[in-house]
């Protein structure tokens, strides 16, 4: 990369969401990669200073390594557009839609993309009504949170109530979702092209926050080991799921493949993790792209905003 073309780069990290600690890890990894690539890059934590300082400090573009609320929900993207600062990842609308699992599901269903059935919950929702609709077990999670925070698997009324309360601590929008038994997969999208699929095998329980970021027993396989034909079919559908939300630059589409080899798409992450446990760098490595090359390519795509 010709560093004169990108100028002074701010790596947004940390922030105010429940995923702050993961964002700090992602941001530091991104910052180190950019600096190794001789990019004039600096850390910028919006939790400790106003975004307008980006202009005062002379930044020319932004690498968004924020996760969750106020980072990948369109808020920061809107502020950066008002300041006319190019940034990585998707724009305002796509970021907001992808952050909202409820509205993502509505769009995907309208577009013919397979996603688990769901019911929106409130404090008056009855366990039996929801169980009759979705079957047991079922998943309860906040609609607008990432890293599986507030997510629980339930199969009885007592757990249903406690899981609802746990999810409601993160978001006023809570959904119950059909549980799909199958293989956990993720499809990374880079520059409108799918990368090799990553298969995720959890030792026990769900692929939750602990399993994602701290467990040493969670196993990842990339390439996934699926047949070439099935892999291509999933990648094509994942790319469509990415595009139909209006996503640009890069994203990570999560899904479950059931016993009939039918993919059920769960969500799209528009600012995926970039830690040592993260899946996009793993998929890129399988495609022959080093971590530093991946970070630089994502930054280069910011020129399209």
UniProtKB/Swiss-Prot annotation:
One cellular component term from this protein's GO annotations in UniProt: cytosol
EC number per UniProt: 6.3.2.4
Catalytic activity entry: 2 D-alanine + ATP = D-alanyl-D-alanine + ADP + phosphate + H(+)
GO biological process terms on file: cell wall organization; peptidoglycan biosynthetic process; regulation of cell shape
Subcellular location: Cytoplasm
Cofactor binding annotation: Binds 2 magnesium or manganese ions per subunit.
Keywords: ATP-binding, Cell shape, Cell wall biogenesis/degradation, Cytoplasm, Ligase, Magnesium, Manganese, Metal-binding, Nucleotide-binding, Peptidoglycan synthesis
Co-factor requirement: Mg(2+); Mn(2+)
Protein's job: Cell wall formation.
Protein name: D-alanine--D-alanine ligase
Protein's organism: Nitrosomonas europaea (strain ATCC 19718 / CIP 103999 / KCTC 2705 / NBRC 14298)
């Amino acid at each position: 990369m010709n560093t004169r073309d990108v100028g002074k780069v701010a790596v947004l990290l940390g922030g105010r969401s429940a995923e702050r600690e993961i964002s700090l890890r992602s941001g530091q990894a991104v910052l180190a990669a950019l600096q190794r690539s001789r990019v004039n890059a600096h850390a910028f934590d919006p939790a400790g200073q106003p975004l307008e300082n980006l202009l005062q400090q002379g930044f020319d573009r932004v690498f968004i390594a924020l996760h969750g609320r106020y980072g990948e929900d369109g808020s920061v993207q809107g502020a950066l557009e008002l300041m006319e600062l190019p940034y990585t990842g998707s724009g305002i609308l796509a970021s907001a839609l992808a952050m909202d699992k409820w509205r993502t599901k509505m769009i995907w269903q309208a577009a013919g993309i397979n996603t688990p059935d769901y019911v929106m919950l409130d404090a008056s929702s009855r366990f039996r009504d929801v169980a009759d609709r979705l079957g047991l077990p079922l998943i309860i999670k906040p609609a607008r949170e990432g890293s599986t925070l507030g997510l629980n698997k339930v199969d009885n009324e007592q757990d249903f109530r406690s899981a609802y309360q746990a999810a409601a601590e993160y978001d006023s929008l809570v959904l119950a979702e059909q549980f799909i038994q199958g293989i956990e997969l993720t499809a990374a999208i880079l520059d409108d092209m799918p990368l090799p699929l990553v298969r995720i095998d959890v030792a026990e329980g769900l692929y939750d926050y602990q399993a994602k970021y701290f467990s040493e027993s969670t196993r990842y396989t990339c390439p996934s080991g699926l047949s070439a034909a099935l892999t291509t079919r999933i990648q094509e559908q994942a790319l469509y799921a990415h595009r139909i939300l209006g996503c640009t630059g890069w994203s990570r589409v999560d899904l479950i493949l059931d016993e009939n080899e039918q993919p059920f798409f769960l969500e799209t992450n528009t600012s995926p993790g970039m830690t040592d446990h993260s899946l996009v760098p793993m998929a890129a490595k399988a495609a022959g792209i080093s971590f530093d090359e991946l970070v630089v390519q994502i930054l280069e795509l910011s020129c399209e905003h």
